[in-house]
Design a protein with these regions (language model features):
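Alpha/beta-hydrolase fold nucleophile elbow
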Residues: 156-168
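Catalytic histidine-centered segment of alpha/beta-hydrolase-like enzymes
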Residues: 282-293
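Alpha/beta-hydrolase active-site loop
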Residues: 135-156
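Short beta-strand/loop motif that positions the catalytic acidic residue
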Residues: 241-243, 248-250, 254
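An N-terminal hydrophobic leader/cap segment in hydrolases
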Residues: 3-67
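Hydrolase active-site cap/lid region
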Residues: 176-228, 237
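Conserved alpha/beta-hydrolase "acid-adjacent" motif
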Residues: 255-261
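Conserved alpha/beta-hydrolase
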Residues: 109-131
Length: 315
């Protein structure tokens, strides 16, 4: 009898610990720290992108907008590029990563702007000036991007060329948007391929426990509290069968999302213009930091291969 009681207590302790870890993991995703504009500006300046911030704040023609998406206000801006006067117009929508805001988009928006694209930057739900009580790593965010695409078509014309660029969570969001829209291209910088795999790798690396201990609890809590289906946040499933050129960028020293996620995604791409580029000595979301010139060259080469950029367009 005593051994049965001990076994029951041990099982109860394991369940309680699993529930605690599941809740902590869920909260890291849905209610992470939110860095303000001053923090992100300082970070981007330290990383060498003060020129992009200056161009945005002093040179670009900025038009703010707010879109109402499923009870959430998405705050953003579009920058009409005087060089983007042809037909059709060309627009790049930039999606930032977890914990930051639209100022993190500027280093990427600058590449497109100088290449003759008009650009759109925005705060993902829960971050920056957008509203929202929680984040879903791309589930709801992809629908927001689909709404932004519809808005962009109203502003720039139904026939406009639309591309997506995303970093980290923003990259996953851009890829998940393929469930709802067919952009002309996607550039995904350090995305995850599958959220369950990402959780499993994080747990093994940091807590040395298997995903099976917490996944059922985490899934139930996410669905019950946030209507968040964590298992459906699977960019690789969204990519499969979609004839959209996708350029994947990833640091080989990424300690948050291993570059193998981008390798998996590349294998799922069907468009012949899809590419994968790995950057030596680049940690998470730092490929453009460690190799800015090469990063820009690869972006422009990809756009050229897609028929969207040529030397005659460069400013």
């Amino acid at each position: 009898m005593i051994w049965c009681m001990i076994a029951a207590l041990l099982l109860l302790a394991v369940f309680a610990l699993s529930a605690l870890i599941a809740e902590k993991c869920l909260q890291m995703v849905v209610n992470p720290v939110r860095y303000d504009v001053d923090y992100v500006k300082a970070l981007e300046t330290t990383n060498g992108f003060s020129d992009c911030i200056e161009a945005y704040e002093t040179k670009w023609q900025r038009t703010p907008f707010v879109l109402h998406c499923a009870g959430t206000d998405i705050s953003g801006e579009y920058m009409m590029n005087p060089a983007d006067s042809g037909t059709p117009r060309k627009v790049a929508i930039i999606c930032h990563g977890h914990t930051v805001n639209r100022y993190s988009d500027l280093k990427y928006a600058d590449i497109f702007y100088r290449a003759g694209f008009s650009t759109v930057i925005f705060d993902e739900r829960y971050f920056g000036e957008s509203t929202g009580d929680f984040c879903t790593l791309g589930q709801n965010e992809a629908r927001d991007v689909a709404a932004i695409i519809a808005y962009v078509r109203q502003i720039f014309g139904q026939d406009c060329v639309i591309g997506l660029h995303g970093e980290s969570m923003g990259a996953a969001t851009a890829l998940l948007t393929l469930k709802y829209e067919t952009p002309d291209f996607v550039i995904a910088d350090c995305p995850f391929a599958d959220s369950k795999l990402l959780f499993a790798q994080w747990l093994k690396r940091n807590l040395h426990i298997p995903i099976g201990l917490i996944w059922p609890i985490l899934r139930r809590r996410a669905k019950r509290k946030y209507d968040y289906d964590v298992e459906s946040v699977c960019p690789i499933a969204a990519v499969q069968g979609k004839n959209v050129p996708i350029c994947l960028m990833h640091g080989k020293s990424d300690n948050l999302i291993p570059y193998t996620h981008s390798e998996m995604l590349r294998k799922a791409c069907v468009n012949p213009n899809s590419e994968l580029h790995l950057f030596e000595n680049a940690d998470h979301a730092r490929s453009i930091v460690v190799a800015r010139t090469e990063y820009e060259r690869l972006v422009l080469a990809f756009l050229h291969n897609c028929g969207l950029y040529g030397t005659e367009n460069k400013q």
